[in-house]
Amino acid sequence: MPHNSIRSGHGGLNQLGGAFVNGRPLPEVVRQRIVDLAHQGVRPCDISRQLRVSHGCVSKILGRYYETGSIRPGVIGGSKPKVATPKVVEKIGDYKRQNPTMFAWEIRDRLLAEGVCDNDTVPSVSSINRIIRTKVQQPFNLPMDSCVATKSLSPGHTLIPSSAVTPPESPQSDSLGSTYSINGLLGIAQPGSDKRKMDDSDQDSCRLSIDSQSSSSGPRKHLRTDAFSQHHLEPLECPFERQHYPEAYASPSHTKGEQGLYPLPLLNSTLDDGKATLTPSNTPLGRNLSTHQTYPVVADPHSPFAIKQETPEVSSSSSTPSSLSSSAFLDLQQVGSGVPPFNAFPHAASVYGQFTGQALLSGREMVGPTLPGYPPHIPTSGQGSYASSAIAGMVAGSEYSGNAYGHTPYSSYSEAWRFPNSSLLSSPYYYSSTSRPSAPPTTATAFDHL
């Protein structure tokens, strides 16, 4: 085959056994043979096996041929041939002037129809748009003689020459320091500059005053939104020239406001209270944070008391401590300092606990809500009612009768109670909880007779 010449180090064999060269397209003869076989009706897979060319290469060549009609390879990694020749550019300009609303794809089809370009040299749609944008529609600042579109302009339509635009000669010609300002592009002479330079040695220029030169120059004709004049910058820089951190030192402007927010007596009293909390002292606090706030102060401490709980005679099988439900086992005794505080509740042992609060409640008042984690005590019929105010919300013992509950508890539930609707019981989908009778014994099947 004509394409089986292999360069050392740059070629090889494909999966079909055909030779190829890396980075080089198929020869023209092989491309034409692929197209001829496709015209004869040979399938691309058969063309690939017969010519020993990969299926992807065959599909790419045929797809490009069906789309553009060309079998020439595309250039990879190189520059494309110049399609925007002067003749093509002039034709595109003529089409655009005749019909300004013509689209780029219509211009491309017209170039092919009139034979200006062929399938290989016709510019793409993006190239035509670029030609119209850069060459047909001449920019405003280019000379007139280089514009192709101005050759057929009517006498009544003229363009402003570029010499009418007077760009700024230097950045100093613009009063605002910008070369591309509106006044510079429009050629408007700017009046005297209203800017003044800041004197670095003047540290007392923080007052809001207008310079005599700035006031005499008249109103400003052009105000830029992205820059501020020195007249506007001076008031903004005044606080920073005085001090960078206004909260670091007290200034006359902040003194009145701080005195209104934080009175001096209140600050002093707060500091004294803070010192009292840091140092241990037995003296009660006598000063509050403010006059309208009051706090209760414990004036007289009480003598320590202990609660002694004795084990009842009835043995208990639980490992938890007995509830202080009966007043017969409670006794308030004043103990000395030698009694250690309790840490646990061992079963069948005496428990001592010290309380240094206010006057303790009576033995019966310690039950109920005062013991968290235990249910409220319900007295029996033999025990009297509670007269303490600590458990006033509970029901008195006299209201409970010693008799047992009159109604018998339910040991089982009937079907009618569980399903009040009788239609559910008669439904074939309902299965009763009663045991079903066992199935009758079946007779001997046919397997027994075999």
From Swiss-Prot:
A GO cellular component annotation in the UniProt record: chromatin
Q: What keywords tag this UniProt record?
A: Congenital hypothyroidism, Developmental protein, Differentiation, Disease variant, DNA-binding, Nucleus, Paired box, Phosphoprotein, Transcription, Transcription regulation
Region RED subdomain: what ranges?
87-135
Quote the DNA-binding region ranges, renumbered to this chain: 9-135
**Which molecular function term from Gene Ontology is one that the record holds?**
DNA-binding transcription factor activity
Tell me the outcome of changing residue 31 to H. In CHNG2; loss of activity
Gene that this polypeptide is encoded by: PAX8
UniProt xrefs under SUPFAM superfamilies = Homeodomain-like
Q: Which GO terms describe its biological process?
A: anatomical structure morphogenesis; branching involved in ureteric bud morphogenesis; cellular response to gonadotropin stimulus; central nervous system development; DNA-templated transcription; inner ear morphogenesis; kidney development; mesenchymal to epithelial transition involved in metanephros morphogenesis
Q: In which tissues is it expressed?
A: Expressed in the excretory system, thyroid gland and Wilms tumors.
Enumerate the InterPro entries for this protein: Homeodomain-like_sf, PAIRED_DNA-bd_dom, Paired_dom, Pax2_C, PAX_fam, WH-like_DNA-bd_sf
Q: What is this protein identified as?
A: Paired box protein Pax-8
Which residues lie within the region annotated PAI subdomain?
12-68
Protein task: Transcription factor for the thyroid-specific expression of the genes exclusively expressed in the thyroid cell type, maintaining the functional differentiation of such cells.
**Superkingdom of the source species:** Eukaryota
Compositionally biased region (Polar residues) = 159-182
* PTM annotation (Phosphoserine): residues: 303
